[in-house]
Amino acid sequence: MKSYAIILGGGSGRRMEADRNKVFLPLRGIPAIVRAIAPFSGLCAGAVVVAAAAEVEEMRGIIARCGLDRFVLRVVPGGAERQDSVRCGLDALPADAECVLIHDGARALVTEDVIRRAIESVEARGSGIASVPVSDTIKRAAPDGRVLETPERAALYAMQTPQAFRVELIRQAHD
């Protein structure tokens, strides 16, 4: 199954109070976006990076300087919302794409094992998503803040990325 990655790099960094897009911030001297892309390069045929329109050229430059320009097929501008940016990435995929892994560029610590398992899930079931069991106590509350329920932790998972799909399934979801 021919797999490609869509790396979403259009965030602003506001929640972490950064003065720029957090994907450009260095982690041990390497931009977070580079750390997010690199693990896909051994498992996918290529990647499309989606960036904020004003940052497309900066993104291309970082990718080239870090030696990922052969793996990254295109850098395209994103949309107003995450789902719009995913659609921009889908539209930029090569025609031979069968599996797509959609990953947040700020999640710089993704491993090849997580990526491999996502691809295997697509091969077996058509989709898959990285997740971790919840360790925090979660409460379901009424609009007034009154606690209604404490869900059983064993049944709760925090969703992460990559989110992986057969290309035709995610395209249908966006149509």
Task: Name each region found by the language model.
Residues 11-14, 54-55, 80-81, 105-108, ...:
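Short glycine-rich anion-binding loops that position phosphate/pyrophosphate groups of nucleotides
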Residues 16, 40, 59-63, 118, ...:
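Hydrophobic packing residues within well-ordered alpha-helices of enzyme cores
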Residues 109-175:
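Conserved core of the sugar-phosphate nucleotidyltransferase
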Residues 1-57:
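N-terminal glycine-rich phosphate-binding loop and ensuing alpha1 helix
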Residues 33-98:
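Conserved N-terminal catalytic core of the sugar/cofactor nucleotidyltransferase
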Residues 6-10, 50-51, 102-103, 131-133, ...:
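Short beta-strand segments
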Residues 7, 33, 89, 103-104, ...:
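Residue-level signal for inorganic ion chemistry
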Residues 96-107:
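Short beta-strand-to-loop acidic/aromatic patch adjacent to the donor-nucleotide binding site
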